[in-house]
Amino acid sequence: MRLIIVSGRSGSGKSTALDVLEDNGFYCIDNLPAGLLPDLAERALLNTEMLLPQVAVSIDARNLQSHLRRFPELLEQVRQRNIRCDILYLDADDETLLKRFSETRRRHPLTDENRSLAEAIADETQVLAPIVDLADLKIDTTHLNLYQLRDSLKLRLLNQPEPGTAFLFESFGFKRGMPVDADLVFDARCLPNPYWKPELRDFSGLQQPVIDYLAAQPEVEEMYQDILAYLEKWLPRFAASNRAYVTIAIGCTGGHHRSVYLANRLSQALKKPLKNVQVRHRDLS
């Protein structure tokens, strides 16, 4: 049995996550009281009429805070039943969450006559601390639209042909902010920039003209070899520590050329030794 627990601050995309999982064969339960987690696991395993190989539940700030404080204990009870359990935590920056609530005009679960929306959003971080501290996978949805979020969820949660640690190589542009869910970040902005070559500007780091240009630059090759040597040594240690997900982010200014080239090349080089390797280009439209 596989169980995915979806959590995160209100407005971060939990409903979308459940929709994606339901569309891919998961039995989904929204707003499950955390105290019922062990009972749900037991019933799903033992009741032949309720044999559910894939279950997803959302647990968030709508829960009793006393149940949320017990979350580590409840999770341990589930994992003692030899259930594969992943915790997905979605979040976005405060400004983005405020904007989303303003657009939908929905009520935040923590607002009341003494607590404004901005205060509720800030307080929710503390309320969910017992869950976020145990999250296997964190996704920052600040810069993701609905379709990008759905694609990201499919890539990280559903596209895992091999058991063990899933390694995501993600390119990004610093001008849109660093991915807060990255475990390792490498900065490629010091490398020669194809953007300043008019004949290369409209190509991406996945296309041959840019690939040929960057492959011919000694600094690019030197950085690639240095990063590759580091990752070859240390990523197996991440896997040995039973990490479910590791994100390696490579950034350049716009996220179109240098970071894309390096992320793609590194993912190809490490695909065989690491087995479960994925690649995503955050800012490549």
Curated annotation (Swiss-Prot):
Q: Where along this sequence does the record place binding of GTP?
A: D60, A61, R62, N63
Keyword entries, A-Z: ATP-binding, GTP-binding, Nucleotide-binding
Q: Name one GO molecular function term.
A: GTP binding
| Superkingdom of source | Bacteria
What InterPro entries does the record point to?
P-loop_NTPase, RapZ-like, RapZ-like_N, RapZ_C
* Pfam families referenced in this protein's UniProt entry, alphabetically: PapZ_C (PF22740), RapZ-like_N (PF03668)
The entry's ATP-binding residues are: G8, R9, S10, G11, S12, G13, K14, S15
* Family affiliation: Belongs to the RapZ-like family.
Return the NCBIfam families for the record. Answer: PRK05416.1
Instruction: Give the protein's biological function.
Output: Displays ATPase and GTPase activities.
Q: What name goes with this protein?
A: Nucleotide-binding protein Pmen_0867
